[in-house]
Swiss-Prot record:
It comes from Papaver somniferum (Opium poppy). The lineage of its organism: Eukaryota, Viridiplantae, Streptophyta, Embryophyta, Tracheophyta. SUPFAM superfamilies: NAD(P)-linked oxidoreductase. Its main location: cytoplasm. Coiled coil: none annotated. This is NADPH-dependent codeinone reductase 1-5.
Amino acid sequence: MESNGVPMITLSSGIRMPALGMGTVETMEKGTEREKLAFLKAIEVGYRHFDTAAAYQTEECLGEAIAEALQLGLIKSRDELFITSKLWCADAHADLVLPALQNSLRNLKLDYLDLYLIHHPVSLKPGKFVNEIPKDHILPMDYKSVWAAMEECQTLGFTRAIGVCNFSCKKLQELMATANSPPVVNQVEMSPTLHQKNLREYCKANNIMITAHSVLGAVGAAWGTKAVMHSKVLHQIAVARGKSVAQVSMRWVYQQGASLVVKSFNEARMKENLKIFDWELTAEDMEKISEIPQSRTSSAAFLLSPTGPFKTEEEFWDEKD
């Protein structure tokens, strides 16, 4: 366990990752001094894992914060941090993976990433990131060649580990059928309102660590929901344990054997979110949470197309109607 109280998880490749990270998606202060100061404050209070992506447009600001943290002595070396970034869909082509990773490194002002993830199991026509994706730009991903390029990035030392995001059991199976090195992480939505039981069991059987996002319902994000934070069950447990609803939700994810990323620019909540590792939910608590109605918050609508690889949410997530 690190001095900040966050346990270290050993991934199947052997590298160690903090169980809790700070997410950087959907910040309202994108590219501003306030955003940089929030990242600096997170480092100061004890966060050592930061989760970014080319699509988030937060890499440059995070890079500035890391450089300033080193200058201020908040950390002694870059090696104290675990930095994750993601390959955007328009770069999910064999010849574009390495250049995309190198561009992320330039943005972050780093020599290497700790973890590089495929952002979605779909490709787009090459080009700059756009918020509104034309439906005819959505393409099937060639898992074999794209993953081989990811493996090459790791071999070259530009990233210490590689993984995926938003992959179902079926899509993981397809990718691993031709992979030399399996993904070490699958980052997906997971919370008390989306347990992901089947996916968790599949990933555990294949030594893939799940990293949960939207643990608190992603309130404030375009796809967010208040179902987690307004849950009566979680509120009752929180009162009984002397914890917050957020802490109960995060602790539940951790007790399922998953790692997690959460986001807050509020210093008090940053500190509160770190305090989930020195107590446990009881078997009774876990049973109550198991009965919470389930629903997915994140949507793949922007990656669906009548002419693309996935026409419906059910096809994208491999869920039955």
